[in-house]
Regions:
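Hot-dog-fold acyl-thioester-processing enzymes
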Residues: 2-99, 151, 161-172
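Short flexible/disordered coil segments
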Residues: 97-99, 122-131, 155-164
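Hydrophobic beta-sheet segments that form the core/acyl-binding groove
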Residues: 101-144
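Flexible glycine-rich active-site/ligand-binding loops centered on an Asp-His dyad
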Residues: 133, 137-143, 148-165
Length: 172
């Protein structure tokens, strides 16, 4: 988590989160903490919220009859948690998410597992149309408590340059 304290007047500080475009270095890896232990309530809630009622995610008896032997955590929840875990390191200052590609679910995630995530900066370039911003691309990997990769994706975001973020402009 990137957290800074900015002095806004003598003896008074305001916290600031996230990275400016210039602070991203290709090859750097950010380990996102804390991890998140998945509960049955998390899984049921997300399946119902998104109207994904496949029994593999909500019916223990059905899950017992599958090759997995139990219910699985619904995949979009895994991805959503990984995105959320990465916000403070990758996209807290983002102007716009430009998209996700190469989303892969590589190993089952089960209720009771703890999900961890990390993001590697794989590319960055200045925006051709927005001189105060740049495009940063990261590969985010989710792992369970045993270090087994469960999911990955590539994400690109439009990031402001130093001093050009919304909070810089409005004294936030």
């Amino acid at each position: 988590m990137v957290k800074k304290m900015n002095e806004i007047s003598p003896g008074r500080y305001r916290e600031s989160f996230g990275r400016y475009y210039e602070e991203f270095v290709v090859g750097d890896i950010y380990e996102h903490r804390p991890g998140r232990t998945i509960t049955q309530s998390d899984n049921i809630w997300f399946t119902l919220l998104t109207m994904n009622q496949h029994p593999l995610h909500i019916d223990d008896e059905y899950g017992k009859g599958t090759e997995f032997g139990k219910t699985l955590v619904v995949s979009p929840f895994t991805v959503a948690l990984m995105v959320g875990m990465s916000v403070s390191d990758v996209s807290q200052k983002t102007v716009a998410n430009l998209g996700w590609t190469d989303i892969k679910m590589t190993h089952p995630l089960y209720v009771g597992d703890t999900l961890y995530a990390e993001s590697e900066v794989i590319e960055k370039r200045e925006s051709k149309s927005r001189p105060d911003e740049g495009i940063v691309t990261v590969k985010t990997i989710g792992k369970n408590q045993d270090g087994i990769e469960v999911a990955s994706f590539i994400r690109s975001a439009l990031i402001p340059k130093d001093g050009k973020a919304v909070e810089d402009k409005i004294d936030y």
